[in-house]
């Protein structure tokens, strides 16, 4: 045992205590993942050493054969996972093994529901890593020394996972980290050579460095025909394939191997939704292995959270989270790139304005969109699952990626008046295929909620004529539509914003009936404008309504109601919006208003109709007290 000095006891960060408790209770049905997590970390440590040694070869300390070793001590009831990777110094041990240095941590804990299955999935997304050791261990001892440090700079970390840990200085001749798990009494099944070999084969076959286990000496024996079978000396042997999975031919890699590799790079517990493995040759050469997760990570909307792909150059790990190879609207994509063209000393700054980077980014973006198109075409139910998780992120695409705007638009899904449901399952291609003869626009409405969109008076004329309207109620929709102007050469038109042009969908008989109705209430618009004054830009008759007496419409050159709400919610200054007040000349209330000779009552009715229309469109009023007063006055008059 190493000499121990300068020993200190520290308390775990509160979040670590919570995570340890959650893991022990939520992951007990999948205990063996502890080995996957620890072997995965050991492989990452080897990758990091290989990268650092590119600029400082002495870090290898004469030992460049990187590997992970698993050993068992049945008498002590322990397993040890050791690596000769980058290692840690005292400060790193305290930071990495005592805290969770991850943005969005509090958000993660607030999302936990108490439902074991859901929580275990969420914990998997969070990435439990090292702490998974406590699923099976009652005590964990970590000994580590950073590559390049003296043997006297070793550090030992010990904990029973119950609130605190001790850290001490030790002598450690070899660089790297060894983790010893003292197994709980009911977990001793893991202190078995064949059990560990089967777990490594199941979860870690794809790890690109060898995972070694000790094979005992096999004495000389007699063969079936009496010949002597020579003795085999004891030795360390690799129990995994130890080749970089992404360099292998697609036909040689099983679905199970792809799934386990995804879990290795993403630390997700769930299988991916779909993946794409490609070898690109020609002007730019690289391998890519891209995965679309089945579930959105809890921190997808956290601006501080890094997103991106693992980057390798000539099979040497360079960095995690290389965001330059994927547009922001595809930030949920996991995977890796292995380039033959980038320099080994590449940095994030070099990647920023690099032609090779741009070519790879374009290629990877195209691959992901093609993957999604295939899923949407071949398995609509699976695609709806994807849309429920990532639809709002994909809606950022048309604004960010002009080159692929049409492709992204084809992947979008919306609710529609075609279905009596808030399910977003109508594609733009579906809509276009159902367009009426003479229809040249794609009509849509944006609102605070599906219910508000569905019950908007602006839909009335479309229902009457049987014209489909897309119902949009996500916060991102208004912003999306400001960047999405057409699809399949059909332009979009908001039914609440600007003039309503039904083009050839308006028949001559309808137009004549409209003109006749307007004659019956001639002069009304001028009287109403006099009452409302500067509150409105214009008062006019409309035929977009069939059941409602009036509506307000945002000016075609100004902001829509939803955009104003978005900007106000973001604390942005918003110019005063002027609306057009539109009256339905065929409605009995409007006819009654035209016949009203008492100017005071006329004013009150006008204000009430305007406020009703504003309430329907905006969801609130600037002066609700005045609305209530006018309404009460009119009700009292009617009651007399």
From Swiss-Prot:
It comes from the Bacteria. It comes from Pseudoalteromonas atlantica (strain T6c / ATCC BAA-1087). Homodimer. Molecular chaperone. Has ATPase activity. Residues 349-565 are annotated as: B. Keywords: ATP-binding, Chaperone, Cytoplasm, Nucleotide-binding, Stress response. One of its GO terms (molecular function) is ATP-dependent protein folding chaperone. PANTHER family: HEAT SHOCK PROTEIN 90 FAMILY MEMBER. The keyword Transmembrane does not apply. The gene is htpG. CDD domains: HATPase_Hsp90-like. Residues 1-348 are annotated as: A. Residues 566-640 are annotated as: C. Disulfide bonds: none annotated. Belongs to the heat shock protein 90 family. One of its GO terms (cellular component) is cytoplasm. The keyword Nucleotide-binding applies. InterPro entries: HATPase_C_sf, Heat_shock_protein_90_CS, HSP90_C, Hsp90_fam, Hsp90_N, Ribosomal_Su5_D2-typ_SF. It is found in: Cytoplasm. This is Chaperone protein HtpG.
């Amino acid at each position: 045992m190493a000499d121990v000095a300068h020993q200190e006891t520290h308390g775990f960060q509160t979040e670590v205590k919570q995570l340890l408790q959650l893991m022990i209770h939520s992951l007990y049905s999948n205990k063996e993942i502890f080995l996957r997590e620890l072997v995965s970390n050991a492989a990452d440590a080897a990758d990091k050493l290989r990268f650092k040694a590119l600029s400082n070869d002495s870090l290898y300390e004469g030992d460049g054969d990187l590997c992970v070793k698993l050993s068992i001590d049945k008498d002590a009831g322990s397993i040890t996972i050791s690596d000769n990777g980058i290692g840690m110094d005292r400060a790193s041990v305290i930071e990495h093994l005592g805290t969770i240095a991850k943005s969005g941590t509090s958000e993660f804990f607030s999302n936990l529901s108490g439902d074991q299955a859901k929580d275990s999935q969420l914990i998997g997304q969070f990435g439990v890593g090292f702490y998974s050791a406590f699923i099976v261990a009652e005590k964990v001892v970590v000994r580590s020394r950073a590559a390049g440090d003296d043997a006297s700079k070793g550090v030992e970390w010990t904990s029973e996972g119950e609130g605190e840990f001790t850290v001490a200085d030790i002598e450690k001749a070899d660089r790297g980290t060894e983790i010893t798990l003292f197994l709980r009494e009911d977990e001793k099944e893991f202190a078995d050579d064949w059990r560990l070999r089967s777990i490594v084969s199941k979860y870690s076959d794809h790890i690109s460095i060898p995972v070694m286990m000790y094979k005992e000496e096999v004495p000389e024996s007699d063969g079936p025909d009496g010949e002597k079978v020579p003795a085999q000396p004891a030795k360390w042997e690799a129990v995994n394939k130890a080749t970089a999975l992404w360099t292998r031919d697609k036909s040689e890699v099983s679905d199970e191997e792809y799934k386990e590799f995804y879990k290795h790079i993403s630390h997700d517990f769930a299988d991916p939704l779909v993946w794409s493995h490609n070898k690109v040759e020609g002007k730019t050469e690289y391998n890519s292995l891209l995965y679309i997760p089945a579930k959105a990570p809890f921190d997808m909307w956290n601006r501080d959270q890094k997103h991106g792909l693992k980057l390798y150059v000539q099979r040497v790990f360079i960095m995690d989270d290389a965001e330059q190879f994927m547009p922001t609207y595809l930030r949920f994509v996991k995977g890796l790139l292995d380039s033959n063209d980038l320099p080994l000393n590449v940095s994030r700054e070099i990647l920023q304005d690099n032609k090779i980077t741009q070519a790879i980014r374009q290629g990877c973006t195209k691959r992901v969109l093609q993957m999604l198109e295939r899923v949407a075409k071949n398995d609509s139910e699976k695609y709806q699952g994807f849309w429920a998780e990532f639809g709002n992120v994909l809606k950022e695409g048309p604004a960010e990626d002009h080159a692929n705007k049409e492709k992204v638009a084809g992947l979008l899904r919306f609710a529609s008046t075609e279905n009596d449901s808030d399910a977003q399952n109508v594609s733009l291609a579906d809509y276009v295929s159902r367009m009426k003869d003479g229809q040249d626009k794609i009509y849509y409405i944006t609102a605070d909620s599906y219910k508000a969109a569905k019950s908007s008076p602006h839909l009335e004329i479309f229902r009457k004529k049987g014209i489909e309207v897309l119902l949009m109620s996500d916060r991102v929709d208004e912003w999306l539509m400001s960047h999405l102007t057409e699809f399949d050469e059909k332009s979009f038109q908001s039914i609440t914003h600007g003039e309503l042009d039904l083009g050839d969908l308006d028949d001559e008989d309808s137009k004549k009936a409209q003109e006749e109705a307007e004659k019956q209430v001639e002069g009304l618009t001028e009287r109403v404008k006099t009452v409302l004054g500067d509150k409105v830009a214009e008062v006019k008759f409309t035929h977009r309504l069939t059941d409602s007496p009036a509506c307000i419409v945002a000016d075609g050159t100004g902001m829509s109601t939803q955009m104003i709400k978005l900007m106000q919610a973001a604390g942005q200054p918003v110019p005063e919006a002027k609306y057009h007040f539109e009256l339905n000349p065929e409605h009995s209330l409007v006819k009654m208003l035209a016949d009203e000779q008492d100017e005071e009552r006329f004013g009150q009715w006008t204000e009430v109709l305007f406020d009703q229309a504003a309430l329907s469109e905006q969801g609130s009023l600037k002066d609700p007290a005045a609305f209530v007063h006018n309404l009460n006055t009119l009700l009292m008059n009617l009651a007399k």
